[in-house]
Design a protein with these regions (language model features):
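Conserved beta-strand segments that form the floor/walls of ligand-binding pockets within enzyme
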Residues: 31, 83-87, 107
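A short acidic/small-residue loop/turn micro-motif
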Residues: 54-57
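Short beta-strand scaffold segments in enzyme catalytic cores
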Residues: 31-46
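A structural microfeature
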Residues: 48-51
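Alpha-helix exit/C-cap motif
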Residues: 26-29
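Short HxH-centered metal-ligating active-site micro-motif
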Residues: 61-95, 100
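Zinc-dependent deaminase
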Residues: 1-24, 80, 90, 96-158
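Small-residue (primarily alanine) positions within well-ordered alpha-helices
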Residues: 17, 21-24, 34, 65, ...
Length: 158
C-alpha cells in the first residue's frame, strides 16, 4: 500500500489525538495521543477509542499512546475498516501492535521528532498518511523543553 492521501476527516480525528497528547503532558507524561476510528472517507469516521501515553503516570513502560488507545478499544473481532491516528510516528512496539491487529491505515501527526517505523509499516501493506501537523510538533517541543530528563529517558535518548 505505502503512503496515502489525507481525507476530509483526518485533521478532525488528529485534533482528538492531539487533545489526548496534551492531557498526557499536563499530567507530567509523554505527550503522545492516539485515537482509533472505524469507517471510510466516503462514509465518515466513527470514534472507537482514545488514549495517551501513560508510561510515566502508571509507571508502565509499555503504556504508549497507541497501546493505551488499543487497550481502551477492548476486544474487537476485526480492525479491517479502522484507522489509527497517532500524534507521533509509532515505535517498533506500537508498529508491531498495528501489524498484529491488521490495522490497515495509520495517520501520523508528525515524524520529525521521532521517525519511528513508517517504512516498516508501509512495506507490510499499511497505508501511512503523514500530516506534518504543527500542533503535534509544538506539543513535543514543549515536552522536550519542560522535561529534558524524561525526554532523554524515552525515545530522545536513542
Amino acid at each position: 500500500m505505502g503512503y496515502g492521501q489525507v481525507d476530509h476527516s483526518d485533521r478532525e480525528m488528529m485534533a482528538l489525538a492531539l487533545g489526548q497528547a496534551r492531557a498526557s503532558l499536563e499530567a507530567g507524561g509523554v505527550p503522545v495521543g492516539a485515537v482509533l476510528a472505524a469507517g471510510s472517507a466516503s462514509q465518515g469516521w466513527q470514534l472507537i477509542a482514545a488514549g495517551h501515553n501513560e508510561r510515566v503516570q502508571r509507571g508502565d513502560p509499555v503504556a504508549h499512546g497507541e497501546i493505551s488507545c488499543l487497550r481502551n478499544a477492548g476486544r474487537r473481532s476485526s480492525y479491517a475498516r479502522t484507522t489509527l491516528y497517532t500524534t507521533l510516528s509509532p515505535c517498533q512496539m506500537c508498529s508491531g501492535a498495528i501489524l498484529l491487529f491488521q490495522i490497515p491505515r495509520v495517520v501520523v501527526g508528525e515524524a520529525q521528532t521521532f521517525e519511528g517505523d513508517l517504512g516498516f509499516l508501509a512495506d507490510r501493506g499499511v497505508q501511512i498518511v503523514l500530516l506534518d501537523d504543527p500542533g503535534c510538533k509544538a506539543v513535543m517541543r514543549e515536552f522536550q523543553e519542560r522535561y529534558p530528563q524524561l525526554w532523554s529517558e524515552d525515545i530522545g535518548g536513542r
